[in-house]
């Protein structure tokens, strides 16, 4: 995806909260993972309910009388600051690791708890490599328990239910709160915090077209990638039996759509037909020219059919039989001079639209976070939520604007840089130092175009685009450097080097065979 990919998305699950310590995680977890294993997940995403805090005379937050008192998360130290981070994607995890890396006065080093509904951190820009077979799941989706083994960061696998912030009490001259507030989790846990970080991510927006929610495959999470891989494998087995071409429809020609089309067309080769649909008459409308041109060359060489200037009106089953897995997509022209048409597909991949998981439910109230129309928290330039000096927001949860007044894109590159500033500004706030305003540095954009192909347009050399195997190697190196923790980077680096050596030997053997056979 462009500039790395969008930040972490949370998928509902039925597990209760689990506190993972280093010893427990080592004893009970392994790093193995089967890509073909079934994931039972729903597409209904978690909602963040903002409820009115009931404050008594002493300034503490209480639960409403008609609710059962939740269990309180026990912090190890009652004196040191308490930092609760919601969301374990690029924004949340890297903020936690940044806090861990800073030098603290002994009595001020914060206790950090990270809450996420998944047991794994997902490096989303490389989900495409799961479809091409370039990477293993453990390489791009390590367990939090493994990543946090040698840190003081605690991990809770749970779902956020309610926020009860009380730092708004210190705004506009009112009494200053002695605590930041409380987070209620779906399992019944209550976390009292001094500082809160909102990094809840987003989910695919499938409810804009009839049939998309029920029939289309999003490509946004690890679970999505596994489902798509399983579906493609099923279609490949069917193709092997009857020789029928595999018809793939990709909705959207942004970075995600183009990367998917390039990866799948390479995987299927002459066994499949890939059609990419886009409302604009161009692909990658916001990308550098070099990336767009490189992508067009690859898509053309792999015979990807581009249906540009079309809107998807609806998605329907090809028949009323559940076992019939074909679909019809009704396309309406978004540009003059085009005619409506209906195309058929064996699988529909949806890559357009995302909605933040931070959602405001109450129209008013002193503790309601200020959200924009997209459901993102309004923040100041230090990444603090406006009106809530003890709450920071980043990634998909934040609506920070650049120097030109435009909202920053919700990419992993932005979240990665915001995490660095968020960690530092929490340090500064705890130590009574000035907070730093966030300044985004665009390092460029890169995308995968297949197993040995990619395109990179670095921002520091105008007009330069690295393509083909060189771009592919540079992209993997850049992402290797961005992986969390030195230990994980080392393990993945060794694994990728070994795979590269095996591929090189296989290629050499293939070339020698061709030479010896005279072909």
From Swiss-Prot:
Cofactor note: Binds 1 FAD per subunit.
Class of this enzyme: oxidoreductase
Subcellular locations according to the entry: Mitochondrion; Mitochondrion inner membrane; Plastid, Chloroplast; Plastid, Chloroplast, Plastoglobule
Record GO terms (molecular function): NAD(P)H dehydrogenase (quinone) activity; NADH:ubiquinone reductase (non-electrogenic) activity; oxidoreductase activity
InterPro entries: FAD/NAD-bd_sf, FAD/NAD-binding_dom, NADH-Q_oxidoreductase
Residues at which NAD(+) binds: 246-282
Transit peptide: 1-52
Keywords from the named record: Chloroplast, FAD, Flavoprotein, Membrane, Mitochondrion, Mitochondrion inner membrane, NAD, NADP, Oxidoreductase, Plastid, Transit peptide
Tissue and organ distribution: Flowers, roots, leaves and stems.
Disruption phenotype: No visible phenotype. Increased photosensitivity to high light.
CC cofactor: FAD
UniProt-annotated binding residues for FAD: 82-118
Reported function: Bifunctional oxidoreductase ables to act both on prenyl naphthoquinones and on prenyl benzoquinones. May serve a respiratory function. Involved in an electron flow toward the plastoglobule plastoquinone pool. Required for plastochromanol-8 accumulation and for phylloquinone (vitamin K1) production. Probably not directly involved in cyclic or chlororespiratory electron flows under standard growth conditions, but participates in the redox metabolism of plastoquinone-9 and the tocophrol recycling-intermediate alpha-tocopherol quinone.
Family note: Belongs to the NADH dehydrogenase family.
PANTHER family: ALTERNATIVE NAD(P)H-UBIQUINONE OXIDOREDUCTASE C1, CHLOROPLASTIC_MITOCHONDRIAL, APOPTOSIS-INDUCING FACTOR 1
Name recorded for this polypeptide: Alternative NAD(P)H-ubiquinone oxidoreductase C1, chloroplastic/mitochondrial
Organism listed in the record: Arabidopsis thaliana (Mouse-ear cress)
């Amino acid at each position: 995806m462009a500039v790395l990919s969008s930040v972490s998305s949370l998928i509902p699950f039925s597990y209760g909260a689990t506190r993972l310590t280093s010893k427990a995680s080592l004893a009970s977890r392994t790093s193995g993972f089967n890509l073909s294993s079934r994931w039972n997940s729903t597409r209904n995403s978690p909602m963040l309910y903002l409820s009115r805090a009931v404050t008594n005379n002493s300034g503490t937050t209480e639960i409403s009388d008609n609710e059962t008192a939740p269990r309180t998360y026990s912090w190890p130290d009652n004196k040191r600051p308490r930092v609760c981070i919601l969301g374990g994607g690029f924004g949340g995890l890297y903020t936690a690791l940044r806090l861990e890396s800073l030098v603290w006065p002994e009595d001020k080093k914060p206790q950090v708890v990270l809450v996420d509904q998944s047991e794994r951190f997902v490096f989303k820009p490389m989900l495409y490599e799961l479809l091409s077979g370039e990477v293993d799941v453990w390489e791009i989706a390590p367990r939090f328990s493994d990543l946090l083994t040698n840190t003081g960061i605690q991990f809770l696998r749970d779902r956020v239910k309610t926020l009860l912030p009380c730092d708004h009490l210190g705004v506009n001259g009112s009494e200053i709160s002695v605590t930041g507030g409380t987070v209620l989790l779906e399992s019944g846990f209550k976390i009292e915090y001094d500082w809160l970080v909102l990094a809840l991510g987003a989910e695919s927006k499938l409810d804009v077209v009839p049939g998309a929610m029920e029939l289309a495959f999003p490509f946004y999470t690890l679970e999505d990638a596994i489902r798509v891989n399983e579906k493609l494998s099923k279609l490949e087995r069917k193709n092997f039996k009857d020789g029928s071409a595999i018809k793939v429809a990709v909705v959207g020609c942004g970075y995600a759509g183009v990367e998917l089309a390039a990866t799948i067309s390479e995987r299927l080769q002459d066994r499949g037909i890939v059609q990419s649909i886009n409302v604009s008459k161009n692909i990658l409308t916001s990308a550098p020219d070099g990336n767009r041109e490189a992508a067009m060359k690859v898509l053309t060489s792999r015979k990807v059919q581009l249906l540009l200037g079309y809107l998807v009106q609806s998605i329907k089953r090809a028949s009323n039989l559940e076992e019939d897995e074909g679909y019809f997509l009704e396309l309406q022209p978004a540009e003059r001079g085009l005619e409506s048409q209906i195309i058929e597909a064996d699988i529909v991949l949806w890559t357009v639209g995302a909605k933040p998981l931070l959602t405001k439910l109450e129209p008013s109230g002193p503790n309601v976070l200020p959200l924009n129309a997209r459901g993102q928290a309004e923040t100041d330039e230090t990444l603090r939520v406006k009106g809530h000096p003890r709450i920071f927001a980043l990634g998909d949860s934040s609506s920070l604007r650049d120097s030109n007044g435009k909202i920053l894109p919700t990419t992993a590159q932005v979240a990665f840089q915001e995490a660095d500033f968020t960690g530092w500004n929490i340090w500064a706030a705890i130590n009574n130092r000035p907070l730093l305003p966030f300044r985004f540095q665009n390092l460029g954009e890169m995308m995968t175009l297949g197993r040995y192909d990619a395109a990179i347009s670095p921002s520091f050399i105008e007009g330069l685009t690295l393509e083909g195997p060189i771009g592919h190697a540079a992209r993997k190196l850049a992402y290797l450097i961005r992986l969390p923790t030195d230990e994980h980077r080392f393990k993945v680096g060794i694994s990728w080097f070994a795979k590269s050596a095996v591929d090189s030997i296989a290629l050499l053997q293939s070339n020698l065979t061709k030479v010896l056979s005279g072909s």
